[in-house]
């Protein structure tokens, strides 16, 4: 898995608070247990005019022409509230999002996002409002995320964010739980060699 050190991308301004996981990926799409294929169902109720997903809703921001190809989601407070379904970050990642910016995230959603190699950035409500205003006034322009410096550059302004050092290390180096375990493969092998045969 590639590390996420820096990222420049287009921003989708989702001007809504308390966006829950059922809005992100409705329950009827949760049958699969692999991480791919959920992007087309992202924000199903808002994004489409029909249950078969054949008609896009032209009034939903994700469908606006100027935001096609966006990789950064900007939202209001309490993003990802509701049930703990891991399919929510799967759907966001499968659509192409790599970074989310909001004043706050639901705890389980926040951790699930990090576990799925997405970067949720918490900024103050005032800072998020400033970014909304900039995005609306500068359609088509990208912003820059620097995880090494822990900064968000929007136009000529720099915002600083915080992230647990362990989580930062994992994202920078592209490590998931398996990757972390394999970093200690030699120590694990050495320990296993000392275990009595009847316990193996």
Swiss-Prot record:
UniProt keyword Nucleotide-binding present: no
Presence of keyword Lyase: yes
Domain of life: Bacteria
GO molecular function, one term: 3-isopropylmalate dehydratase activity
Gene3D superfamilies: Aconitase, domain 4
UniProt pathway: Amino-acid biosynthesis; L-leucine biosynthesis; L-leucine from 3-methyl-2-oxobutanoate: step 2/4
EC number: 4.2.1.33
GO CC term, one of those recorded: 3-isopropylmalate dehydratase complex
InterPro entries named among the record's database cross-references: 3-IsopropMal_deHydase_ssu, Aconitase/3IPM_dehydase_swvl, AconitaseA/IPMdHydase_ssu_swvl, IPMI_Swivel, LeuD
Assembly notes: Heterodimer of LeuC and LeuD.
Family (UniProt): Belongs to the LeuD family. LeuD type 1 subfamily.
Role played: Catalyzes the isomerization between 2-isopropylmalate and 3-isopropylmalate, via the formation of 2-isopropylmaleate.
Protein's name in the database: 3-isopropylmalate dehydratase small subunit
Organism: Actinobacillus pleuropneumoniae serotype 3 (strain JL03)
Classification lineage: Bacteria, Pseudomonadati, Pseudomonadota, Gammaproteobacteria, Pasteurellales
């Amino acid at each position: 898995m590639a590390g996420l050190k820096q990222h420049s991308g287009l921003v989708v301004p989702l001007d809504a608070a308390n966006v829950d996981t059922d809005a992100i990926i409705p329950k009827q799409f949760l049958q699969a247990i692999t991480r791919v294929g959920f992007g087309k169902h992202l924000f199903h109720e808002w994004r489409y005019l029909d249950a078969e997903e054949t008609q896009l809703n032209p009034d939903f921001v994700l469908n606006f022409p100027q935001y096609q190809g966006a990789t950064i989601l900007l939202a209001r407070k309490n993003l990802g509230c509701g049930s703990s379904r891991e399919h929510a970050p799967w759907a966001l990642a499968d659509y192409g999002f790599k970074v989310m910016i909001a004043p706050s995230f639901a705890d389980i959603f926040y951790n699930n996002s990090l576990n799925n190699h997405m970067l949720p950035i918490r900024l103050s409500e005032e800072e998020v409002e400033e970014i909304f205003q900039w995005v609306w006034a500068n359609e088509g322009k990208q912003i820059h995320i620097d995880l090494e410096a822990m900064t968000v550059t929007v136009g000529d302004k720099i915002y600083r964010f915080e992230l647990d050092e362990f989580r930062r290390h994992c994202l920078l180096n592209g490590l998931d739980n398996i990757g972390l375990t394999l970093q200690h493969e030699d120590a694990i092998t050495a320990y296993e060699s000392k275990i009595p045969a009847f316990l193996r």
